């Protein structure tokens, strides 16, 4: 259907020897003019052995569309940790704050309050076990 938006965001937090694979797929059909489609894959690597593979894909069969994609993969920003520690936060607390901020970009878009609270609970539980 034309004149619609599609926003696909995938976020991964990887530790140990974990590996994520993102293979995005957006198809814009012939009669879907006016579509705005976007794919984003962001990964936060908590260890030197974690891996993230990204392969965004678009199949566009009409004109008059806007499609974009992006990917980012990296570790926690050491400058951000230093800044928080200079404000009296421990290194572990700083890492948790930054991970929460990374996840919040997705959780904040959830409109269902029950689901949002559950997701926040899951994140906090995982952070407690880091």
Region locations from a protein language model:
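Active-site gating/interface segments in enzymes
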Residues: 1-130
